[in-house]
């Protein structure tokens, strides 16, 4: 009888102690475990201790954003090429520079002016060893309808560059240009080199169209630095004086341009 009474008292004491345990603050979650980040498109889950002393999964995306000198995210999708549907991928452009530009939507306002301007400059890009690809979240059918619409009606009226379809929005998200609240992309441009590395990232807010001349200038400047190992100062254009990136070389440059 005494043993049973003693056991009951111990149990009662334990219950009282449990009731008086100070809860973990909701502002101070106990960190339990973090999985190492990866560049996989899958999410990683971290385990935290919540204010009820219970384990809970917190899931968030760990896809790294594109970075300069890092590999461009692989892509594959249906495109309209020379009026035909065709699957294209990043692998198709190995050994070449690729200027991949995103625009918000087909049948809009600034977008056709950009695409036509890039299309008109396609030969100059090709002479510099660079291919052009435009991309939006529209379907390939919408792309084709827009291409076949006369320019005087706001269409493209035939173009010399592929238009890639990103219906799932995955390519746009991988390249960091998708705006969730808008449901489409901003004007993002990515220059990828022959090794598949990202070399230039530019982003315009949607009211402002891009400069094709600046895209060509930057492409030629990068090609020059890749080939000759010298650097290009501000506003450098093909044929301008470049600079050796060392104290002696920079002094020679500054003396030459400041006579």
UniProtKB/Swiss-Prot annotation:
The keyword Ribosomal protein belongs to this UniProt entry's keyword annotation: no
Active site positions: 111 (cysteine sulfenic acid (-soh) intermediate)
Domain spans labelled Thioredoxin: 66-224
Subcellular location: Cytoplasm; Endoplasmic reticulum
Key words of the record: Antioxidant, Cytoplasm, Disulfide bond, Endoplasmic reticulum, Oxidoreductase, Peroxidase, Redox-active center
Cellular component aspect of the GO annotation: cytosol; endoplasmic reticulum; phagocytic vesicle
Induction of synthesis: Up-regulated in gcsA null cells devoid of glutathione.
Membrane-spanning ranges: none
Reaction(s) this enzyme catalyzes, per UniProt: a hydroperoxide + [thioredoxin]-dithiol = an alcohol + [thioredoxin]-disulfide + H2O
Top EC group: oxidoreductase
Record's miscellaneous remark: The active site is a conserved redox-active cysteine residue, the peroxidatic cysteine (C(P)), which makes the nucleophilic attack on the peroxide substrate. The peroxide oxidizes the C(P)-SH to cysteine sulfenic acid (C(P)-SOH), which then reacts with another cysteine residue, the resolving cysteine (C(R)), to form a disulfide bridge. The disulfide is subsequently reduced by an appropriate electron donor to complete the catalytic cycle. In this typical 2-Cys peroxiredoxin, C(R) is provided by the other dimeric subunit to form an intersubunit disulfide.
Function in brief: Thiol-specific peroxidase that catalyzes the reduction of hydrogen peroxide and organic hydroperoxides to water and alcohols, respectively. Plays a role in cell protection against oxidative stress by detoxifying peroxides and as sensor of hydrogen peroxide-mediated signaling events. Regulates the activation of NF-kappa-B in the cytosol by a modulation of I-kappa-B-alpha phosphorylation.
Subunit structure, as described in the record: Homodimer; disulfide-linked, upon oxidation. 5 homodimers assemble to form a ring-like decamer.
Family: Belongs to the peroxiredoxin family. AhpC/Prx1 subfamily.
Name recorded for this polypeptide: Peroxiredoxin-4
Gene designation per UniProt: prdx4
């Amino acid at each position: 009888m005494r043993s049973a009474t003693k056991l009951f008292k111990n149990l009662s004491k334990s219950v009282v102690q449990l009731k008086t345990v100070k809860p973990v603050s909701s502002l101070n979650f106990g960190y339990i475990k973090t999985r190492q980040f990866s560049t996989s498109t899958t999410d990683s889950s971290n385990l935290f201790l919540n204010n009820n002393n219970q384990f809970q999964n917190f899931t968030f995306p760990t896809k790294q954003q594109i970075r300069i000198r890092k590999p461009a995210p692989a892509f594959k999708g249906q495109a309209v090429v020379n009026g035909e549907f065709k699957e294209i991928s990043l692998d198709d452009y190995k050994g070449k520079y690729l200027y991949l530009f995103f625009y918000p939507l087909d049948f809009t306002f600034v977008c056709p002016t950009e695409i036509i301007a890039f299309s008109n400059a396609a030969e100059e890009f090709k002479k510099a060893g660079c291919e052009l690809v435009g991309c939006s979240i529209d379907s390939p059918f919408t792309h084709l309808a827009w291409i076949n619409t006369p320019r005087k009606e706001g269409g493209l009226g035939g173009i010399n560059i592929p238009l890639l379809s990103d219906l799932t929005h995955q390519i746009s998200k991988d390249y960091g240009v998708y705006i969730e609240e808008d449901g489409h992309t901003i004007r993002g441009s990515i220059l990828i080199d022959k090794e598949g590395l990202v070399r230039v990232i530019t982003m315009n807010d949607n009211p402002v169209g891009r400069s094709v001349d600046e895209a060509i200038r930057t492409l030629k400047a990068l090609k020059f630095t890749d080939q000759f190992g010298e650097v290009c100062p501000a506003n450098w254009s093909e044929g301008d004086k470049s600079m050796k990136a060392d104290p002696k070389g920079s002094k020679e440059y500054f003396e030459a341009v400041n006579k």
